[in-house]
Amino acid sequence: GIEGIVNGMDPTEWNPATDKFLDITYDKNTVVMGKAAAKQALQAEVGLPLDASAPVFGYIGRLEEQKGCDIMMEAVPKLLKQCPNAQVVILGTGKKSMEKTLEKLDKLSPRMAGVVRFSNPIAHFITAGADFLMVPSRFEPCGLIQLHAMQYGTVPIVASTGGLVDTVKEGVTGFHMGAMDPDGLKPDDVEAMVDTCAAAAAAYGSPAHTKMSATCIGQDLSWRKPAAKWEAVLEEMMFNSGYGKKQMVVTPKEDLEGAKT
């Protein structure tokens, strides 16, 4: 049979309790206050208005079609129009055409920040300070970015594909926007992303959102569980193949008789 095992993440690099880039670290017991401080730091870093009540949507990654960035670039202006207090920050590099589009989006609104470069500190600021992390990938064998987000109590908004389906539970640890068309940019996909993000924005600050964030950060997303599954699968494969079993050696009768003479 086929066994699917999702990735784990490195808690030594991605851990809000020990993150060297955060002025105020936090854990599952202090996630509400910690994320509020991280949001303020993120807004100041990328030039967004300092507004604690604004739902902040983030994206970190390559700017390319596989990651659904063309969908996101079309969706963001609609989202900002539909949700007047929402803020968006996008960090990434990739296709030159998409980098230029992101530079244009950066000038679209004071509530939109586009950072066209790689920055590890800003990646950590977004992971901690955003309220939602957008992952609109057309395909994603497993993905790590959604695990990083949940580790920090940031709720992922994901396309329903690959490992994103396995790691993000609708209404429990995130929002699903449905599967994206793999063959090109479709208006229905853009609308699905806008609608899902708008629904998340409407839920922001509610008890349901607070519970979702707490559920995210309360998970063990390290390699401990995946490693145990790998070990169990490999042991089963070895057993089924007969590897390591003692082989019974039967000596032919004529050889035994010959040995007596």
Segments (PLM) and residue ranges:
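Catalytic cores of carbohydrate-active enzymes across secretory and cytosolic contexts
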Residues: 1-261
